[in-house]
């Protein structure tokens, strides 16, 4: 329990450091790199990130940072990042509708041990199912496919992220 709690606090601290300047936003890609960086071997094959620059408000960055932290932790303990040759691929896009912009992303694990449906719902699953919808109106779906966990998530982007400049040092 202590280790999990410490990891969650570290994740929050990392995200807050990214947001130290209130007039700037942090990119979704940087939040991903912040959480997944320890597993990136530099080959561009173990961790694959693909998508446009998407600035996030502090609320979105903190909430998504926690979700990505939980996905990363589970991948490292039980999934594709727990074995040599395992891979995490995150693809994202922004769609522009009549009244809002929506960020959609897919987290896809492959090359890990066979996946089975968990016996109980862990913190990460509860975060995706209940916390993110309440905090940032996100909708997510988790598929425990035998060849790797897949997560699809969609969330509205606030209008203010359109005009906020991202930190130049990220």
Task: List each model region and its residues.
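Short beta-to-alpha transition helix within the HATPase_c
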Residues: 3-41, 91-93
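Conserved short strand/loop->alpha-helix "switch" segment adjacent to the catalytic nucleotide/phosphoryl-transfer site
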Residues: 41-87, 119
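Conserved transmitter core of two-component histidine kinases
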Residues: 44-52, 105-108, 142-143
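Short beta-strand/loop element within the Bergerat-fold HATPase_c
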Residues: 85-100, 108
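Hydrophobic core positions in the C-terminal catalytic ATP-binding module
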Residues: 88, 140, 149-155
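Glycine-rich nucleotide-binding loop
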Residues: 113, 145-152
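ATP phosphate-binding glycine-rich loop and adjacent ATP-lid/helix-beta elements
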Residues: 113-141, 169-170
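C-terminal end segment of the histidine kinase catalytic
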Residues: 153-170
């Amino acid at each position: 329990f202590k280790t999990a709690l410490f990891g969650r606090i570290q994740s929050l601290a990392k995200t807050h450091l990214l947001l130290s300047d209130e007039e700037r936003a942090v990119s979704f890609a940087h939040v991903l790199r912040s959480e997944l960086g320890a597993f990136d071997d530099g080959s561009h094959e173990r961790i694959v990130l693909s998508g446009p620059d998407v600035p996030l408000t502090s609320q979105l960055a903190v909430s998504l940072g926690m979700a990505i932290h939980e996905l990363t932790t589970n991948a490292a303990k039980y999934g594709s990042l727990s074995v040599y040759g395992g891979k995490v691929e995150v693809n994202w896009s922004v769609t522009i509708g009549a009244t809002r912009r929506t960020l959609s992303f897919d987290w896809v694990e492959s090359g890990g041990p066979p996946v089975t449906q968990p016996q109980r719902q862990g913190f990460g699953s509860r975060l995706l199912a209940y916390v993110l919808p309440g905090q940032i109106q996100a909708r997510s779906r988790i598929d425990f496919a035998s060849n790797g966990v897949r997560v699809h998530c969609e969330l509205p982007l606030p209008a203010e992220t359109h005009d906020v400049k991202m930190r130049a040092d990220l």
